[in-house]
Amino acid sequence: MAREVLDSRGNPTVEAEVHTSSGISGRAIAPSGASTGSAEAFELRDTADARYDGRGVRQAVANVDSKIAPALKGYETSDQRGIDQRLIELDGSRDKRNLGGNAILAVSLASARAAAATRRVPLYRHLHELYQQLDSSAPPPRVPLPMVNMISGGLHAGGNLDFQDFLIQPIGAESYADGLEWIVRIYRRLGTLLSGAGYEGRLVGDEGGYGPRLKSNVEAVEFLIRAIEAANLRPGRDVTIALDVASTHFFDGRNYRLIATGEQRLSSDEMIEVMADLVDRFPIKSIEDPLAEDDWRGWKRLTSRLGKRTRLVGDDLFATNVERLQRGIRDHAANSILIKLNQIGTLSETLQTVFVARQAGYGYVVSARSGETEDTTIADLAVATAAEHIKIGSVVRSERLAKYNRLLRIAEEIERPS
C-alpha cells in the first residue's frame, strides 16, 4: 500500500508499505530533487490537478495500490532482484514514467526494509549482503566521511551564488562522532563570521546551509577557510573543502553563464580554468558537476587536468545510471560518481551502479536530495557499500539530522567490541 506524505519542502511524495504474510512490514519514502539531471528516473506528479499546485502524487500512490501491489503478491521480500525486475517490467518505459520512479523506488526500498525486519538484522547488514551478491570482494560495512553543506547557492537557495553547495569534509577526525562535532563547531563559527561581516547568518537553504548574498563564489570558499580556522582546525590538514557546482543549470548549450560577479559567459575550457584556479588556491578535494551533464569532451579534458589532484564527481553527468557511467569510464570522464537512489529508481540498479564504479576504480558518494524526509535508508546504504563519503546536507533541519543520528547509532554497533 502507499500514501501521499510531505517532504522537507512541503511537497508531496510517495510513502510505501510492504506487508508480508508473517505480519512483518517495511516502510520507505521516496525523496525528491530540485537540481535534477535529464537522465533521471521520471517523478510522476499530478500536474493537471490544482492540489499542491500540481505537485501531488495521488496517481503514483494509486499505481502502487492498483498495479504494483497485485503484481508483487507472492514474492519473497528476500528476492530483491526479482522484485525490482518485476517493477521495471511492469512499468515498461526507459525512465519509469508509466508507474513513476517515485512509486517504484518507495516500493523497492520498503521491500528491503521488510526483508531486513524479517531476518531481524539491521538494514545496513541486509543491504551489505545484497551488495555482496554482486561483489564478492566487497569491503566490510563502514561509516563514511560526511561531506557537509555549509553555504548554499544555485537552486538550493535564493541568493546570488552560481555554485550550488560549498561543503567541508572532516578528514582528520579520529571517529565519525568527533567529525560531527567539528562540523557543528565550524557551522556555528561560520554563522558568526557571516553576521559579523554584515551578511545574513541565520537564513538557510533547502539543505540547511547558510544562504547569504555574497560578492562571489570565491568569497564563499574564503569564508569556509576562516570558519575552519575560527574552530581551531587546520584547512587542508584537519578539514578539506568540496564544491557542488551543478553547472548544468547555468549552461545554455554553448556557454556557462555566471552571474555572481556580473554577467560572464565562459566556454568549457574557460570553466576548466576556473576550476583549476580554485584547486590551486584552496584545499578543495572534491568538485561535483564542474561541467554540464552532456559536456563529455570538456569532462575528459578536465579529468586529464585535475583528476590526480581532486575528486571529480559526476552527478547529473551519470544520474546513477550504469550506461552513462560506463561511457564515462570509457571516455575517462570524472573519477567519482554521486549515488542517488531516486535517480535510477530501484535498489538493485543502485547497487549495480556502485559495483560498476568500484570495479573501475571510481569513487562513490551516497547522497540525499534537497527534498528529504525522516527516511534514513541512505545512511544504511552508504555503510553497506563502504562508501567513501555521504552527502546529507547541513547539521540543521531534522530530515538531515535523522540520517546523521542514524550513522551515530550504526557507528556504535560497528565499533563495539565483539
Question: Predicted regions span which residues?
Answer:
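Catalytic core of soluble alpha/beta enzymes
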Residues: 200-201, 218-418
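Mobile "lid/hinge" segments at catalytic clefts and subdomain interfaces of large enzymes
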Residues: 132-133, 141-205
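Short, Gly/Pro- and small/polar-rich lid/capping loops
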Residues: 1-13
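Active-site-proximal beta-alpha loop/turn segments in soluble metabolic enzymes
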Residues: 165-176, 201-217, 249-261
